[in-house]
From Swiss-Prot:
Gene3D superfamilies documented for this protein: 3.40.1360.10, 6.10.250.240, RecR Domain 1
Record InterPro entries: DNA_Rcmb_RecR, Rcmb_RecR, Rcmb_RecR_Znf, TOPRIM_dom, TOPRIM_RecR
Superkingdom: Bacteria
Biological process per Gene Ontology, one example term: DNA recombination
Keyword Cell wall biogenesis/degradation belongs to the record: no
Designated name of the protein: Recombination protein RecR
Zinc finger residue extent: C4-type: 59-74
């Protein structure tokens, strides 16, 4: 029988294992690394977690995370308030910002519709999106959702819900990635790229 690491360490491992991408073995390795490097990793991480817990809030406008409410993006007067980009989670918003291709505002849904997981419209920030899309000056809502079954189901549902607002509803183009070679792509990606083709 394997020896226990002790309740404090097991609790740390258990909490780390709840993070996305970390299973029990990875969590155990992470816990050991933190404990071996207490001064360099564990203490600063503990301070950063405490500060984040105390200061980071959810933006009441878009649903992003920031230390201010409304967040820095919603408060930025230089951004195009006529464009709202809808994303699944905050990580997707951060990816869009890293790409630097969008200068409008965002709306974080907080997930996707999923019959399998029992996630319905009431579990997402759909009502606030419809309200924002109906505000004067908003002219386009861009659905930047994953190209998955749940992502497409959610996009279709949102397009129907936004039909009453006087806005254009668009989706991100899908298809061949930059640097992608056709013989390495799956059939669905190639078919979508063909349907989404545009003039050269």
């Amino acid at each position: 029988m394997a020896a226990s690491a002790g309740p404090e360490i097991e609790r740390l491992i258990g909490l780390l294992a709840k993070l996305p991408g970390l299973g029990p073995r990875s969590a155990r390795r992470a816990a050991l690394a933190l404990l071996k490097r207490r001064d360099q990793l564990l203490a600063p991480l503990s301070d950063a977690l405490a500060e984040a817990a105390a200061r980071v809030k959810t933006c009441s406008t878009c649903g992003s995370l920031d230390t201010q409410d409304p967040c820095a993006i919603c408060s930025d007067g230089t951004r195009d308030a006529s464009l709202i980009c809808v994303v699944e989670e905050v990580g997707a918003l951060w990816a869009m910002e890293r790409a630097g291709a969008f200068r409008g505002r965002y709306h974080v849904l907080g997930g996707l519709l999923s019959a399998l997981d029992g996630v319905g419209p009431d579990a997402l920030r759909v009502g606030p999106l419809v309200a924002r899309a109906s505000e004067p000056g908003v002219r386009e809502v861009i659905l930047a959702l994953p190209a998955t079954v749940d992502g497409q189901t959610t996009a279709h549902y949102l397009a129907e819900r936004l039909a009453g607002a006087e806005v254009t509803v668009s989706m991100l183009a899908r298809g061949v990635p930059v640097g992608g070679e056709l013989d390495w792509l799956d059939d669905g990606t190639i078919a979508q790229a063909m349907r989404a083709r545009r003039p050269a």
